């Protein structure tokens, strides 16, 4: 046997040994995963994500996936001649855009994720927040530096989540894959930021962890250094000085709210890293940034 193969085998054995206490600790617990970024678009990362999710289920962890679909939505909007516009990280969504959002998220993207997981031996089931009306939504109005209460169309925030549907799937041994579309009081569809849905769902399921996959290493300071632990106070400072802005704002807000409201650990991790989920859950060092719910020192 070549020496490098021996080293590789030894490394694999060490990793398994390191993972064992975490497998024991987290077996039976719920982990909510916000799936987005490059991990959703690069073939190798997509396949790796599906395998990792199946592995989590095999060792007794209950993954619940909430997915985005920004690049796919943008591509479809461009095909029909509509240009995407964002306010404070939220997509402006008129009626025509909402039809496209629902078609892309609930149709193409959701089904592709479900198919990929099932290809690797999982039992994934795709659902939309409109199914059984389990995600109730209300219109989201945005405050900007120029104006308060900006109406950005059929964009919603989570009013309530009935977890019965998701819990039922978990009890049947399935992996729920949730498209972040909610339903209003008149039955109308609302586009909801996937980070918001993931955070609220993690709260309602009393999840052990909330993992948010991104295209960056985590939360960075102005000099580009990774901040591995953050308190709500520190995050407020980073927003005030402009370090955090745009699409990071709803992600950070959801992570903080989940941490404050009982999710045991919330993490922003780099979805470009192969096996990012396993590295965060099953290794001592973990990866990315952890959001603390209290006033602990960061």
Swiss-Prot record:
Its main location: cytoplasm. It holds the Pfam family AA_kinase. The keyword Mitochondrion does not apply. The keyword Transferase applies. GO terms for biological process: arginine biosynthetic process via ornithine; L-arginine biosynthetic process. Pathway: Amino-acid biosynthesis; L-arginine biosynthesis; N(2)-acetyl-L-ornithine from L-glutamate: step 2/4. HAMAP family: ArgB. This is Acetylglutamate kinase. It comes from Neisseria meningitidis serogroup C (strain 053442).
């Amino acid at each position: 046997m070549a020496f490098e193969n021996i080293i590789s085998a030894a490394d694999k054995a060490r990793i398994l040994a390191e993972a064992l206490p975490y497998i024991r600790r987290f077996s039976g617990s719920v982990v909510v995963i916000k799936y987005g970024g490059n991990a959703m678009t690069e073939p190798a990362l997509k396949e790796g994500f599906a395998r990792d999710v199946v592995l989590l289920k095999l060792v007794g962890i209950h993954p619940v996936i909430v997915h985005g679909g920004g690049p796919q939505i943008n591509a479809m909007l461009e095909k029909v001649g509509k240009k995407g516009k964002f306010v404070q990280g939220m997509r402006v969504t008129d009626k025509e855009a909402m039809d496209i959002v629902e078609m892309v998220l609930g149709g193409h993207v959701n089904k592709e994720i479900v198919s990929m997981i099932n290809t690797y031996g999982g039992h994934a089931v795709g659902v939309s927040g409109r199914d059984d009306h389990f995600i109730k939504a209300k219109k989201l109005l945005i405050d900007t530096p120029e104006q308060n209460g900006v109406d950005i169309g059929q964009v919603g925030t989570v009013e309530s989540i009935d977890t019965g549907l998701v819990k039922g799937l978990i009890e049947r041994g399935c992996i729920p894959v949730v498209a972040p579309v909610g339903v209003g009081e008149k039955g109308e569809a609302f586009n909801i930021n996937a980070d918001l849905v993931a955070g609220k769902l993690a709260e309602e399921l009393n999840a052990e962890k909330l993992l948010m996959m991104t295209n960056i290493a985590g939360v960075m300071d102005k000099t580009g250094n990774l901040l591995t632990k953050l308190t709500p106070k520190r995050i407020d400072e980073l927003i005030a000085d402009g370090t955090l802005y745009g699409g990071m704002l709803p992600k950070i807000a959801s992570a903080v709210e989940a941490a404050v409201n009982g999710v045991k650990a919330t993490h922003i991790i780099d979805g470009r890293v192969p096996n990012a989920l396993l590295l965060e859950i099953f290794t001592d060092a973990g990866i990315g940034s952890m959001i603390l719910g209290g006033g602990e020192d960061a």
